[in-house]
Amino acid sequence: AQLVEGSTAKDYQKTETRLNIPRLDYSNGTCPSLLVEPQRTNILKYSEDFENIYWYEEPGNSVTSNTTISPSGIQNADTFTAVGGSEMNIHNVATFPLTTGTYTYSVYLKNNGTNLIEVYLYQIGPGFVAKGEINFSAETFTASIGTGTITNVGNGWYRVTLTNSVTAGDFTTGVYTTSTTGTRSVFVWGAQLEAGSYSTSYIPTTSASVTRNADQVAKTGISSLIGQTEGVWYLDLYATGKNKDGAGYATWLIAGDSSNNFQIYNIGTTLYWYAKNTGGVLIDQTANQTLVEGERYKIAFAYKAGDYALYINGVQKRTSTNANVPAVSQFNLSAEGYGASPVIVKNEYNAVALWTTRLTNTQLAQLTTI
């Protein structure tokens, strides 16, 4: 027996204990990245079934199910259509409560003859609290309330997102256009509303909200695999993640505990390298590298008593002659904090490796060249 999220069966995975399968993201090409994300809940129900009574079509509007191939590769995307003098407006049939906080609404859209389509988050009383418009021909998404993003996911589909902070109240989400001329139509799939200041990967729902657990990449008790006097930590990743508050990309690597550790982390768009042992902080410096969201970075953190170096994309960024080396026996990827339950942040890793000897500077440059 097997239970999976969504309305479609997946290939059977034999298990004797809990599955421990990494999630892979192919959006950056044919070679996948390891996707690491925090726990999130899709608050919206029937996220792919807009004909369900959970959704409401205003007079003059209609929804036709399963009319075209969605980003999932299955023919399960719906068509929204408005005719006559009616505005297109399809939204939740009933409001739902949200507590005070920051939320992100996302939905997948594909052009079906109407170039300008708007999406929104609406609060009873104040009105629109997040609102934006996609221009299919220009491949842009402009937020008039809140902040927005657009991602081309292929085959004419775009994922648009809206983010804003709200006060507690009752809300609804929707897709609409103010045009009342002719027939207006758009393909729609995969609606999601989640608490947080950025969107995470799509979580399908049916009759109830669904929570996806955090992806934790960690290992303890491996002092024999980590160089205790010298070595190299290596990361190859895309700067696509955010920290728990959304302000930047947060910790990319943390090896060790609160007394002895190596870290690669950021504050905003500034990257840092850090080392500490029981005697105190050894290194805490900027990496002379401004981060650009969506860019790829290859990073090598080399350490040895009196011979530290940091290389990024083939260039030596920092050195240190500190004579001390942290003794570590564990590591976490994309986590803020130590121990078994750190706060997970979002990142996409192409490769992670470590060496128990310090590579030469020439080797570090070659290793990190893109």
Question: Which residues make up each language-model segment?
Answer:
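Extracellular glycan-interaction surfaces
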Residues: 67-96, 103-179, 186, 190-193, ...
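Extended recognition patches within non-cytosolic domains
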Residues: 3-33, 194-225, 317, 350-370
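Extracellular glycan-recognition surfaces and repeat-rich motifs
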Residues: 22-32, 53-79
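GGW-centered surface loops in extracellular recognition modules
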Residues: 6, 19-48, 169-197
